UniProtKB/Swiss-Prot annotation:
The keyword Mitochondrion does not apply. Pathway: Secondary metabolite biosynthesis; terpenoid biosynthesis. The active site is at Y150, K154. This is Short chain dehydrogenase adrF. Its EC number is 1.1.1.-. The keyword DNA-binding does not apply. The gene is adrF. It comes from Penicillium rubens (strain ATCC 28089 / DSM 1075 / NRRL 1951 / Wisconsin 54-1255) (Penicillium chrysogenum). It holds the Pfam family adh_short. One of its GO terms (molecular function) is oxidoreductase activity. Belongs to the short-chain dehydrogenases/reductases (SDR) family. The lineage of its organism: Eukaryota, Fungi, Dikarya, Ascomycota, Pezizomycotina.
Length: 255
């Protein structure tokens, strides 16, 4: 029997990229999933009886509570929360950053995951079990990978991850983070390249080029690689891994 058989997961950002890869892999291993995304759910997921979906904006005040209540109504419990949804920021430096970009990045990349954790923790405490996995980035541990808003949002999420891990470690609840390298998903394509801070990008180009070289040599990180790590962290095989920040980037994080 699969280690994920019948476990119940909430997966945000499940309509594309890493979220889609994770939901697809989890379903193939017998998990029950509530997917959440601002976009429509792919037919490849909705055809599964064990997949339920909410199309919602995670920054709306009522959404986190709605997500958790729906999961309990559909499946009766919550074994794992995977906070995968996120946006980029145009690589804006602090002196080119707009208020709108700062607020959107923080709202989606930091505030929404924290509010979802706030909603699931009481249920996990009652169950005396649960695993939360937050998705970071190279920018979660470095200042030379993205713009100031994205970098701040991912650093903040790593701090929240560690705090939650420590606070609830005696209650059977774990909280970890996975930091992907440059995975080819729609997150970059969703932004307008004409608005990017090209001067800021130029200062990071040697870092980005080092990672791009891996892809050219067939060593690039794929969404499925991230999914494998995420699902390991919600499985019983990782029961003593708690508060970890795990890069999945073929050593990009050592730069």
């Amino acid at each position: 029997m699969s280690l994920l058989q019948d476990i119940v997961l909430i997966i945000t950002g499940s309509a594309s990229g890493i979220g889609l890869a994770t939901a697809t892999a989890a379903l193939s291993q017998g998990a029950k999933i509530l997917g959440v995304d601002v976009s429509w759910a792919p037919v490849s997921l909705t055809e599964h009886a064990s997949y339920k979906f909410i199309q919602a904006n995670l920054t709306h005040e009522a959404t986190p509570k709605q997500v958790v209540e729906t999961c309990i109504k559909e499946f009766g419990r919550i074994d794992g929360l995977l906070n995968i949804a996120g946006i980029m920021d145009q690589n804006s430096s602090v002196d080119s950053l707009t208020d709108d970009m700062w607020e959107r990045c923080i709202a989606i990349n930091l505030t929404a995951p924290v509010k979802l954790m706030r909603e699931v923790i009481p249920i996990m405490r009652q169950q005396k079990s649960g695993s939360i996995v937050n998705v970071g980035s190279k920018a979660a541990t470095s200042g030379a990978a993205s713009g100031v808003a994205y970098t701040a949002s991912k650093h903040g999420l790593m701090g929240a991850t560690k705090n939650v891990a420590w606070r609830y470690k005696q209650e059977g609840i774990r909280c970890n983070a996975v930091c992907p390298g440059g995975v080819p998903t729609g997150i970059v394509q969703a932004s307008d390249p004409t608005t990017w801070d090209k001067d800021a990008l130029a200062t990071m180009s040697h870092i980005h080029q080092a990672h791009a070289a891996d892809r050219q040599e067939g060593l690039g990180v794929e969404a499925e690689d991230i999914a494998n790590c995420l699902l390991f962290l919600v499985s019983s095989q990782s029961k003593r891994i708690n508060g970890a920040i795990i890069p999945v980037d073929n050593a990009w994080s050592v730069i």
